[in-house]
Amino acid sequence: DGMETVKARQDYFKSLGGAMKALSGVAKNYDAEAAKAEAAKLEAILATDIKPLFAPGTSDADFPGESEAKASIWENMEDFGAKGQAMHEAGMELIAAANTGEASAFGPALKKLGGTCKACHDDYRAEH
C-alpha cells in the first residue's frame, strides 16, 4: 500500500533527523563517549535499505499533503541515488570521526553530512 510506504519513509527520515539532532548536541558540547554512542545509532539507521521506501506511486503528487517526496525523484533516479550515496558516505565518515574520539574531526564530518541532507532536500523534498 502506497500510504504505508509513505509513512515508513517518513518514520525513517524522522529517525535520521533525530540522530542528526542528537549528533549536533554532541558537537556543541563534545564528549567522545557520547559521540561514539550516537554514531552507533546513526550506523544502525544507515544500515537500512531505503530503496523500498521510494516505491513508484508514493510522491507528493500521489499523496498530496501527506508525502513530501517530489515526483522528480523518479524522473531523476540516478541523481537522487547519487545524493543518497553521498549521504551514506558522509554518514560513514562521521561514524569514523566519532570513533577516533577527536572533537576536531567530528564537527567537520557532521557539517558535511548535514550538507548532503540539504542538497537532497533542496531538489527533492516538497514544502508543505
Swiss-Prot record:
What are this entry's molecular-function GO terms? electron transfer activity; heme binding; iron ion binding
Q: Name one GO cellular component term.
A: periplasmic space
Q: Which Gene3D superfamilies match?
A: Cytochrome c/b562
Key word Heme present in the record?
yes
One GO biological process term is: electron transport chain
Positions with a binding annotation for heme c: R9, K14, S67, E68, C117, C120, H121
Briefly, what is this protein's role?
Cytochrome c' is the most widely occurring bacterial c-type cytochrome. Cytochromes c' are high-spin proteins and the heme has no sixth ligand. Their exact function is not known.
Question: What name has this protein been given in UniProt?
Answer: Cytochrome c'
Instruction: Write down the species.
Output: Rhodopseudomonas sp
